[in-house]
Amino acid sequence: MLGAKKQKAWLSDQEFAKKFGLSVVDTTDNRYELLAIPFDGTIPRFAQNVKKQRIQGEELTIYYDLQCPYVCQNIEIIKEYCTINDVPLSLIQVDTLQKAKELPCVFNNYSVFYKGNFQTVNLLDIAYVKRILKK
């Protein structure tokens, strides 16, 4: 189960899970936590590419899949804004198991990076894009 040191609205309450025996078995540099019950003694871990939540590219980069019905519309809005304003943009659709395993973050449905740094898992609007680009 994915949790966080500080509770996030989109994550299940890990305190509830801990009451049923789950415990923190791994963490990322950004304070996300992996909770599990190691039934057979093996302990799951975050992949190393997830730990730092960083990428090589400097451009605005969005990893996304189509689990949420609003993602397609959101991607088109961001793509149009970036095209009009000459903002370099990389869009990476996570549409295979291999791509999901290679993600640089704990979220496979939507994550945003800028200047190599993880920014958010929230769908972007234009105002949010402008705030990110000012960083």
Spans of features found by a protein language model:
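Conserved acyl-CoA
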Residues: 1
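Conserved active-site alpha-helix within GNAT-family acetyltransferase domains
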Residues: 6-34
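Generic recognition of short, well-ordered alpha-helical segments
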Residues: 11-12, 72-76, 124
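C-terminal "cap" of GNAT-fold acetyltransferases
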Residues: 29-52
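Local sequence-structure signature of Cys/Sec-based thiol-disulfide redox active-site neighborhoods
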Residues: 48-84
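Thioredoxin-like thiol-disulfide oxidoreductase module
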Residues: 89-108
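Structural micro-motif
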Residues: 104-113, 124
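Non-catalytic, surface beta->alpha helical segment in thiol-disulfide oxidoreductase systems
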Residues: 114-135
